[in-house]
């Protein structure tokens, strides 16, 4: 079953895959990494001008990595927001997804955290570097195949 946004995207020839609806009735769409930036700009112009959150997760050990965007469109009033969830999957061997920083500035720290924890490289992000872990940290702690080091260096909080 396709939702309103999916029907609109099909009508305008924009490639995507409908993943159905979540428990709150929010439509979920899958977009290919190579199509994501242009579709993000189109969604912004269409009225999805609020990025509620961006997160990422490891789908399965050795499998794909996912970057998830929750967008909101307020057209008819604050009490009737239209929401959509976008998922962009990337191979773990070279996880590259276009950054949407220039579309939604609020994605700045969120994309950096996804990079820091899962190693997803957000192309054209102006400051893509670690945000939680030290720059010297090796590996991506939230990947399911991550092997934690057997020691941790404790640093002073000065």
UniProtKB/Swiss-Prot annotation:
It holds the Pfam family Complex1_30kDa. It is an enzyme of class 7 (translocase). One of its GO terms (molecular function) is quinone binding. Belongs to the complex I 30 kDa subunit family. NDH shuttles electrons from NAD(P)H:plastoquinone, via FMN and iron-sulfur (Fe-S) centers, to quinones in the photosynthetic chain and possibly in a chloroplast respiratory chain. The immediate electron acceptor for the enzyme in this species is believed to be plastoquinone. Couples the redox reaction to proton translocation, and thus conserves the redox energy in a proton gradient. It is a peripheral membrane protein. This is NAD(P)H-quinone oxidoreductase subunit J, chloroplastic.
């Amino acid at each position: 079953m396709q939702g309103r946004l999916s029907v609109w995207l099909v009508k305008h020839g924009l490639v995507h895959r409908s993943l159905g609806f979540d428990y709150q009735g929010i439509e979920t769409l899958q977009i290919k990494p190579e199509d994501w930036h242009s579709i993000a700009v189109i969604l912004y112009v269409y009225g999805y001008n609020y990025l509620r959150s961006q997160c990422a997760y490891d789908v399965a050990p050795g499998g794909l990595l996912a970057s998830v965007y929750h967008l909101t469109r307020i057209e008819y009033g604050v009490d009737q927001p239209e929401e959509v969830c976008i998922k962009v999957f990337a191979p773990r061997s070279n996880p590259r997804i276009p950054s949407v920083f220039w579309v939604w500035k609020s994605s700045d720290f969120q994309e950096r955290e996804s990079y820091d924890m899962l190693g997803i490289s957000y192309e054209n992000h102006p400051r893509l570097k670690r945000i939680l872990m030290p720059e010297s940290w090796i590996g991506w702690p939230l990947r399911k195949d991550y092997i934690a080091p057997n020691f941790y260096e404790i640093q002073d909080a000065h």
